[in-house]
Amino acid sequence: MKRSLQALYCQLLSFLLTLALTEALVFAAQEPSPRESLQVSPSGTIPGTMVTASLSSTRHSSMVATPASVVTPTPHPDGPSSQATAPMATTTPHLDGHPPTNTISTIMATASTPHSEGSLSTGPLPAAMATTSSHSEGRAPGETAPTILLTKPGEATSRPPTAPSRATIRRPPRPPGSSRKGAGSSPRPIPAAPSGHAGRKDGQRGRNQSSTHLGQKRPLGKIFQIYKGNFTGSVEPDPSTFTPRNPLWGYSSSPQPQTVAATSAPSRTSWVPPTTPLVPVEDKPSLSRADQGGGSTFTSQGGEPDATAASGTPASQQRAPVPSQRPHGDPQDGSSHSDSWLTVTPGTSRPPSTNSGVFAATTGPIQAAFDASVSVPSEGLPQGTSLAPQAPAHPTWASESTVSQAEEKAVATPTPTMMGRVPSPLSTVVSTATGNFLNRLVPAGTWKPGTAGNISHVAEGDKPQQRATICLSKMDIAWVILAISVPISSCSVLLTVCCLRRKKKPANPENSLSYWNNAITMDYFSKHAVELPREIQSLETSEDQLSEPRSPANGDYRDTGMVLVNPFCQETLFVGNDQVSEI
């Protein structure tokens, strides 16, 4: 009985273990992969800031957002853009069979995913980052592409400027997917040799202009700078007025850039350590905290040494003259494309100034939730949910003076996505609602152009298009069936045996051997009586035979006439005169 119970318990345990393993396998197969996991960027740390840059018809750019700001996409004309949602470094594939010539150098690396026409890029990364721009259809691989840089200040903006010491400058860790030739501990990037004669001229022009703006003071605050291509104009919102004072790039007295980086070759990326000692970057491979502030990244197209600089915490009033280094490689960029810096100061609630090709948004303490559903631009036409009036792009041949005038004459036309704080200037296309810039939970590889991002459901994001399916082979199915059926059958058999053993039959005397022996004996003696002696001797005869022994000495009862009864024998031997009994 004990053995049967032990066997039953063992079978039950094996059955339970098998079920548990099967469920674990099923759940593991149903869990989404890391690529489908949603990336949530922190919010609420600083006032939301939105930056939108309008591009020409042959240029692509990727917009970035602050750690707590709204993701700002850039309308791309008929071409794929990059989408950064996962911490990984990849290069953007090119159209028309162009070999990849750009390299990404990021701290929070960006994952670039090609999309169809009208797609846009979002940057929902917790750290300041920039994504690469992909070539358009009619673009040569060696042509310069916009470079975007974003830096989050690490301390309060009201801190008095102090000159950073070189000893406190720390080198940011190398991104996993970028091969770089570091510029050492120097706060100045190493530009590559210009590929053409126009590149040298552009570089000299940038240096000359950078030296003309010495002594200018930049407003303190959290400033996010984005510049791409050539520098033809600049924007800088003033704390006291709504119009910029003078061109922004080339300031030598502006706050020290937090990260100075440049690309020097089509297949390599130069990285320069940050020059701001306020928030040193920890040499961690992940750098998951956006509060460290030293994680500004940049990307640039190959074949052009784009020098990027972003101002983080205003550590000093001196800016490294990195922006003066103009990108080289495309002689037509200096004349056909008008690019400039972008300065966003979220600490103030005044309308921003704008420049050609760049939109500077000063959003101020914008609410955390933007109640607007944004649609994706189709065929490069930025569309907002409110269809805000879009001013024509500033002509590419405009000079700095015209840009400055256009900036001063900018007319504010608020859009619902910016809570009525962002104007629509005359010199740039203001479509801050273009694309799904508020949807920060778009998994990599699952973004579809044309799907609108609902801001009220930020926690949900777009549902993954690829659902996990369980593929079970015949052997797997057989094992599952066996794992379920065998324990049940064995348990049923054991229970049946136990029940049969417990049901004992009533005791039957006929089954015992002793019963039969006793029965035979009693039955025989009941049927057969003991036969008495045949003749009764008289006393005379007995007295006459007194001298004779009653029993023979040798046990011979042949002539005595006595009957020997053996109750355990099958036959009774009657001793008579003519019968001899031998026991």
UniProtKB/Swiss-Prot annotation:
<dbReference type="InterPro" id="IPR031508">
    <property type="entry name" value="TMEM108"/>
</dbReference>
<dbReference type="GO" id="GO:1990416">
    <property type="term" value="P:cellular response to brain-derived neurotrophic factor stimulus"/>
</dbReference>
<dbReference type="GO" id="GO:0008090">
    <property type="term" value="P:retrograde axonal transport"/>
</dbReference>
<dbReference type="GO" id="GO:0036477">
    <property type="term" value="C:somatodendritic compartment"/>
</dbReference>
<dbReference type="GO" id="GO:0097484">
    <property type="term" value="P:dendrite extension"/>
</dbReference>
<keyword id="KW-0472">Membrane</keyword>
<comment type="subunit">
    <text>Interacts with DST (isoform 1). Interacts with SH3GL2. Interacts (via N-terminus) with CYFIP1 and CYFIP2; the interactions associate TMEM108 with the WAVE1 complex.</text>
</comment>
<keyword id="KW-0812">Transmembrane</keyword>
<keyword id="KW-0967">Endosome</keyword>
<keyword id="KW-0325">Glycoprotein</keyword>
<feature type="compositionally biased region" description="Low complexity">
    <location>
        <begin position="177"/>
        <end position="187"/>
    </location>
</feature>
<feature type="compositionally biased region" description="Polar residues">
    <location>
        <begin position="251"/>
        <end position="273"/>
    </location>
</feature>
<dbReference type="GO" id="GO:0005769">
    <property type="term" value="C:early endosome"/>
</dbReference>
<feature type="transmembrane region" description="Helical">
    <location>
        <begin position="7"/>
        <end position="27"/>
    </location>
</feature>
<feature type="region of interest" description="Disordered">
    <location>
        <begin position="376"/>
        <end position="404"/>
    </location>
</feature>
<keyword id="KW-0966">Cell projection</keyword>
<protein>
    <recommendedName>
        <fullName>Transmembrane protein 108</fullName>
    </recommendedName>
</protein>
<dbReference type="GO" id="GO:0010008">
    <property type="term" value="C:endosome membrane"/>
</dbReference>
<keyword id="KW-1133">Transmembrane helix</keyword>
<comment type="function">
    <text>Transmembrane protein required for proper cognitive functions. Involved in the development of dentate gyrus (DG) neuron circuitry, is necessary for AMPA receptors surface expression and proper excitatory postsynaptic currents of DG granule neurons. Regulates the organization and stability of the microtubule network of sensory neurons to allow axonal transport. Through the interaction with DST, mediates the docking of the dynein/dynactin motor complex to vesicle cargos for retrograde axonal transport. In hippocampal neurons, required for BDNF-dependent dendrite outgrowth.</text>
</comment>
<dbReference type="Pfam" id="PF15759">
    <property type="entry name" value="TMEM108"/>
</dbReference>
<dbReference type="GO" id="GO:0030425">
    <property type="term" value="C:dendrite"/>
</dbReference>
<keyword id="KW-0770">Synapse</keyword>
<feature type="compositionally biased region" description="Polar residues">
    <location>
        <begin position="310"/>
        <end position="319"/>
    </location>
</feature>
<dbReference type="GO" id="GO:0051388">
    <property type="term" value="P:positive regulation of neurotrophin TRK receptor signaling pathway"/>
</dbReference>
<dbReference type="GO" id="GO:0097106">
    <property type="term" value="P:postsynaptic density organization"/>
</dbReference>
<feature type="compositionally biased region" description="Polar residues">
    <location>
        <begin position="100"/>
        <end position="122"/>
    </location>
</feature>
<dbReference type="GO" id="GO:0098815">
    <property type="term" value="P:modulation of excitatory postsynaptic potential"/>
</dbReference>
<dbReference type="GO" id="GO:0014069">
    <property type="term" value="C:postsynaptic density"/>
</dbReference>
<feature type="region of interest" description="Interacts with SH3GL2">
    <location>
        <begin position="31"/>
        <end position="176"/>
    </location>
</feature>
<dbReference type="GO" id="GO:1904115">
    <property type="term" value="C:axon cytoplasm"/>
</dbReference>
<feature type="region of interest" description="Interaction with CYFIP2">
    <location>
        <begin position="498"/>
        <end position="583"/>
    </location>
</feature>
<feature type="compositionally biased region" description="Polar residues">
    <location>
        <begin position="333"/>
        <end position="357"/>
    </location>
</feature>
<dbReference type="GO" id="GO:0031175">
    <property type="term" value="P:neuron projection development"/>
</dbReference>
<feature type="transmembrane region" description="Helical">
    <location>
        <begin position="477"/>
        <end position="497"/>
    </location>
</feature>
<dbReference type="GO" id="GO:0006898">
    <property type="term" value="P:receptor-mediated endocytosis"/>
</dbReference>
<feature type="region of interest" description="Interacts with DST (isoform 1)">
    <location>
        <begin position="180"/>
        <end position="413"/>
    </location>
</feature>
<feature type="compositionally biased region" description="Polar residues">
    <location>
        <begin position="80"/>
        <end position="93"/>
    </location>
</feature>
<feature type="region of interest" description="Disordered">
    <location>
        <begin position="71"/>
        <end position="360"/>
    </location>
</feature>
<dbReference type="GO" id="GO:0030424">
    <property type="term" value="C:axon"/>
</dbReference>
<dbReference type="GO" id="GO:0021542">
    <property type="term" value="P:dentate gyrus development"/>
</dbReference>
